[in-house]
């Protein structure tokens, strides 16, 4: 058994370190909601969002569209779960949330939070329906907070 531990140490030293993730340039954001049936920056729409595990699972959830990258939507996920109660745990996991209040995207008008640290790149076909538009001041505050990510 001691040899197995020694072998693991040797192998771990020989492994090449993973290359660092390339930082993407900050996305270009605009505020351009239009009641035209298309997902536009500034709108909260419902879309299928893959889980972070990348195993093919996900769920239909509200997202705030913050821009476009070619024919893909740039969006941030919303939730009605209050992360203020577990803020330390969320921060330790690298997740950052911001309160955005209630809106027409939630039929129960529950207060929502937007996740700032995970920019989603979604196919326009992933959008199921429009929910509502965030007002300009809240949109600008979300974008500023998103850009201040470390």
Task: Identify the meaning behind each predicted range.
Residues 1-61, 65-150:
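Conserved functional hotspots at enzyme active or ligand-binding sites that engage polyanionic ligands
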């Amino acid at each position: 058994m001691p040899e197995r531990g020694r072998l693991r140490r040797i192998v771990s030293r020989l492994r090449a370190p993973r290359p660092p993730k390339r930082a993407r340039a900050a996305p270009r954001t605009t505020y351009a909601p239009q009641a035209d049936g298309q997902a536009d920056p500034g709108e909260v729409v419902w879309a299928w969002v893959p889980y972070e595990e990348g195993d093919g699972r996900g769920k239909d959830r509200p997202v705030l569209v913050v821009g476009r990258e070619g024919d893909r939507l740039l969006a941030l996920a919303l939730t009605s779960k209050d992360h203020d109660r577990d803020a330390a745990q969320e921060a330790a996991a690298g997740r950052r949330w911001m309160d955005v209040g209630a809106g027409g995207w939630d039929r129960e008008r529950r207060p929502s939070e937007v996740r700032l640290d995970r920019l989603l790149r979604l196919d326009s076909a992933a959008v199921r329906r429009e929910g509502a538009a965030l007002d300009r001041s809240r949109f600008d505050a979300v974008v500023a907070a998103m850009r201040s990510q470390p």
